[in-house]
């Protein structure tokens, strides 16, 4: 994005996160070691759990209200690409069958719904059901060995599918 936005990159992010989404805390976005002239942006951001929920709600609202961003989200869903991942890939919620933009899509058992998913460090998950106005957030500290792994079906897929 910095390539397209240019020098106003920080101003653009401030407008999106502060004015539109109305985050309550600072958002940190990543940088790479690439030279500045090539753009050193990184797709990851760090936010509080409540601000992640605000971001998910803004994404869902844009999709449903057919804004410019909403049209873009519909387009990336329409043009999603199959993943070339293995069946045994960990974590299990990451076994979605496709992706578009920065989102996981076509989750097992949820294929009939338009669901955008994001996953993060330590097993954190956000699922957004765009058409049924549902958001599921699972906050996790660790996901690096059997001691810390959780039941994906019980905590993510079943509640999201059944609404409980």
Regions found by a protein language model. Give the residues of each.
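Alpha-helical scaffold elements that line and support the substrate/ligand-binding pocket
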Residues: 1-17, 52-59, 133-136
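Active-site helix/loop module of the DD-peptidase/beta-lactamase fold
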Residues: 3-42, 47, 64-67
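Short alpha-helical "patches" and their helix-cap loops
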Residues: 9-19, 69-74, 150-158
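Alpha-helix boundary/capping residues
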Residues: 16, 20, 59-62, 79-83, ...
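Active-site Gly/Thr loop motif
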Residues: 24-30, 43, 78-136
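Active-site-proximal alpha-helical segments within enzyme catalytic domains
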Residues: 43-65, 124-140
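C-terminal amphipathic alpha-helical segment
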Residues: 48-93
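Structured C-terminal helix/loop/strand segments within mature extracytoplasmic catalytic/sensor domains
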Residues: 115-164
């Amino acid at each position: 994005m910095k390539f397209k936005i240019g020098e106003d990159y920080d101003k653009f992010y401030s407008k999106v996160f502060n004015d539109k989404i109305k985050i309550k805390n600072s958002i940190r976005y990543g940088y790479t070691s690439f030279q500045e002239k090539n753009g050193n942006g990184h797709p990851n951001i760090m936010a509080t759990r409540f601000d992640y929920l605000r971001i998910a709600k803004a994404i869902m609202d844009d999709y449903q209200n057919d804004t410019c961003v909403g049209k873009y989200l519909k387009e990336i869903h329409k043009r999603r690409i199959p993943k070339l991942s293995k069946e045994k890939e960990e974590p299990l919620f990451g076994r979605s069958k496709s992706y578009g933009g920065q989102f996981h899509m076509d989750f097992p058992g949820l294929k009939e719904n338009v669901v955008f998913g994001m996953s993060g460090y330590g097993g954190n998950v956000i699922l957004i059901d765009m058409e049924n106005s549902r958001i599921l957030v699972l906050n996790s500290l660790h996901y690096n060995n059997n001691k810390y792994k959780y039941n994906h079906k019980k905590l993510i897929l079943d509640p999201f599918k059944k609404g409980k």
